[in-house]
């Protein structure tokens, strides 16, 4: 039987780099065969950070970043192929998410924008590429996110338990898998985005490795209470969010209240510890609404946040009724779940199979997501 190899490519809101996953769909369930990671080049990262913080740029700058990302994705794929000793003709298709620079599903003119020229990816790799996964769902009245729960359902559903897959990337989202219930999935809170932005601002580091900085900070109860008062947490699912809400400007507005009220300002380290608590507590608050008393509650954590020992420790402590684990313990590397999902989405698009879940996104109907860019 000819191998059904697909490559998934993902660069998320954390801007750390490009994740690549090789999936074999001749197997059921599909198997993760190999992974790779390309760090985000500093110049591209700086441009993206500036764009995401301001939400404004020139058309020329946007076009240049779009081109640069397309080349980066293509080069990353070609290096990956060399690493796993495969040729472009061995791959059925690439599923490339692109880089989200704006996601606004609830405004008068809803739109989402992912950049990274897929024409370049297809041309430079010689592999049919599927991209632009979110806009068809939004055209059908959906949120365009999250898209990964359908993949989680395929891999992790088990009738005897409630399973929740929690991805802690830049933003935290969940997939809720339960017998006799439609799968639902939605964004629940911030993930690493604020933690990474804050430590970069104050320590010049990309992220807080092993939460070493946060561990020695103290929780500011006043700040934590204000962060948890964000109206997003009161919205009913399905819902989605991103850096356009949870960013340094949002955090600084909260901190400015301390000055306005003549209260002592928390130290940068205390803010970092408070952000960890905010992340864990806002996630746990949502999960407690879902837990069952008559069966096992299993939480499978993936994404960069699963490597943060303080977040994992706090989730375990806050969720006494849950078995807290990671996707790695169930066969899918915590760092490559989303990349693997976009390989799955590409497979579904090439075979014209539905890949959104209206119960998740709120779309009017099922549809095969993505635009095909021939090689």
From Swiss-Prot:
Q: What is its EC number?
A: 2.7.1.170
On whether DNA damage is a keyword of this UniProt record, the answer is no
Residues that hold ATP according to the record: 12-19
What SUPFAM superfamilies does the annotation carry? Actin-like ATPase domain (SSF53067)
- List all membrane-crossing ranges: none
What's a BP term from Gene Ontology annotated to this protein? peptidoglycan turnover
So what does this thing catalyse?
Answer: 1,6-anhydro-N-acetyl-beta-muramate + ATP + H2O = N-acetyl-D-muramate 6-phosphate + ADP + H(+)
Q: Does the keyword Acyltransferase apply?
A: no
Annotated keywords: ATP-binding, Carbohydrate metabolism, Kinase, Nucleotide-binding, Transferase
Pathway involvement of the protein, from the record: Amino-sugar metabolism; 1,6-anhydro-N-acetylmuramate degradation; Cell wall biogenesis; peptidoglycan recycling
Q: What class of enzyme is it?
A: transferase
Q: Name one GO molecular function term.
A: phosphotransferase activity, alcohol group as acceptor
* Family stated for the protein in its record: Belongs to the anhydro-N-acetylmuramic acid kinase family.
Q: Which HAMAP family does the annotation name?
A: AnhMurNAc_kinase (MF_01270)
Q: Tell me, what does this protein do in biology?
A: Catalyzes the specific phosphorylation of 1,6-anhydro-N-acetylmuramic acid (anhMurNAc) with the simultaneous cleavage of the 1,6-anhydro ring, generating MurNAc-6-P. Is required for the utilization of anhMurNAc either imported from the medium or derived from its own cell wall murein, and thus plays a role in cell wall recycling.
Q: What is this protein called?
A: Anhydro-N-acetylmuramic acid kinase
């Amino acid at each position: 039987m000819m191998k059904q190899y697909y490559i998934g490519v993902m660069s998320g809101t954390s801007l750390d780099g490009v994740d690549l996953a090789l999936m074999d769909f001749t197997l059921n369930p599909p198997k993760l065969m190999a992974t790779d990671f390309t760090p985000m080049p500093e110049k591209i990262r700086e441009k993206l950070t500036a764009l995401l913080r301001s939400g404004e740029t020139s058309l020329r700058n946007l076009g240049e970043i779009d081109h640069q990302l397309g080349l980066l994705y293509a080069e990353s794929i070609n290096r990956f192929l060399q690493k796993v000793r495969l040729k472009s003709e061995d791959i059925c298709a690439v599923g490339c998410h692109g880089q989200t620079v704006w996601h606004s599903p609830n405004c008068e003119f809803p739109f989402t924008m992912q950049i990274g020229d897929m024409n370049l990816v297809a041309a430079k790799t010689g592999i049919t590429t599927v991209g632009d996964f979110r806009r068809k769902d939004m055209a059908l009245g959906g949120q365009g996110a999250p898209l990964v729960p359908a993949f989680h359902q395929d891999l992790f559903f088990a009738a005897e338990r409630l399973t929740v897959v929690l991805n802690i990337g830049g933003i935290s989202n969940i997939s809720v898998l339960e017998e006799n219930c439609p799968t639902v999935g939605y964004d629940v809170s911030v993930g690493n985005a604020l933690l990474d932005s804050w430590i970069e601002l104050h320590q010049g580091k990309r992220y807080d490795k092993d939460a070493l900085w946060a561990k020695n900070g103290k929780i500011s109860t006043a700040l934590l209470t204000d962060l948890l008062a964000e109206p997003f947490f009161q919205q009913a699912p399905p819902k989605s969010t991103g850096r356009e809400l949870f960013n340094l400007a949002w955090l600084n507005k909260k901190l400015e209240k301390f000055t306005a009220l003549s209260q002592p300002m928390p130290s940068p380290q205390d803010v970092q510890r408070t952000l960890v608590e905010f992340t864990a507590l806002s996630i746990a608050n949502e999960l407690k609404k879902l837990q069952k008393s008559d069966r096992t509650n299993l939480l499978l954590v993936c994404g960069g946040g699963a490597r943060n020992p303080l977040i994992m420790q706090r989730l375990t402590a806050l969720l006494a009724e849950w078995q807290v684990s990671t996707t790695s313990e169930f066969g899918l590397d915590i760092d490559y779940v989303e990349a693997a999902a976009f390989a799955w989405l590409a497979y579904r698009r090439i075979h014209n199979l539905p890949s959104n879940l209206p119960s998740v996104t709120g779309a009017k109907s099922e549809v095969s997501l993505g635009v095909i860019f021939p090689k």
